[in-house]
Swiss-Prot record:
Residues 81-97 have a biased composition (Acidic residues). It comes from Pongo pygmaeus. Belongs to the SPAN-X family. Disulfide bonds: none annotated. Residues 10-35, 136-148 have a biased composition (Basic and acidic residues). Residues 1-48, 64-160 are annotated as: Disordered. Residues 64-79 have a biased composition (Polar residues). Coiled coil: none annotated. This is Sperm protein associated with the nucleus on the X chromosome N2. InterPro entries: SPAN-X_fam. It comes from the Eukaryota. Pfam families: SPAN-X (PF07458).
């Protein structure tokens, strides 16, 4: 099966058999198919996985962000709420102290000048307003406790 070729100048070369050519072609074809298939699979897989991963990550990010946001909101809101609670408790304490001072004022029956003294001590005008508000709320609570007494006092007011 050796044939001299003109290009080899009389040198004998082995030419491949037809069966070998077929085997090579068959091997090349599946390799080509396999080579194309993985690249297609990779592209398809990467496209689909990218879409799935993006969706998954979005969902995951949303959940993780929500959890982180919830935790951060709890952490950030709680200190704010605690500060507000502290602020409101301070206001409550201020109201309690002003209520006590107004009770003391009532007990001592100080003249109206006591409000001026409060202003001189550095208390704001609002604190005297709060004292007046507390006095009216104390009166209303006393009226609720003693409806007969409030009726009597209202009758006295009508007589004047």
């Amino acid at each position: 099966m050796e044939k001299p070729t003109s290009s080899t100048n009389g040198e004998k070369r082995k030419s491949p058999c037809d069966s070998n050519n077929r085997n090579d072609e068959m091997q090349e074809t599946p390799n080509r198919d396999l080579a194309l298939e993985p690249s297609l699979k990779k592209m398809k897989t990467s496209e689909y996985s990218t879409v799935l991963v993006l969706c998954y990550r979005k969902t995951k990010k949303i959940h993780s962000n929500q959890l982180e946001n919830d935790q951060s909101q709890e952490n950030s809101v709680n200190p704010v709420q605690e500060e507000e609670d502290e602020g409101s408790s301070q206001e409550d304490e201020d109201l309690d102290s002003s209520a006590e001072s107004s009770k003391q004022d009532e007990d001592l029956q100080l003249p109206e000048g006591s409000f001026q003294e409060d202003k001189d001590l550095g208390l704001s005008e609002g604190s005297s307003q709060e004292d007046e508000d507390l006095d009216s709320s104390e009166r209303s609570s006393q009226e609720e406790k003693d409806p007969d007494a409030s009726e009597g006092s209202s009758e006295e007011g009508e007589e004047d």
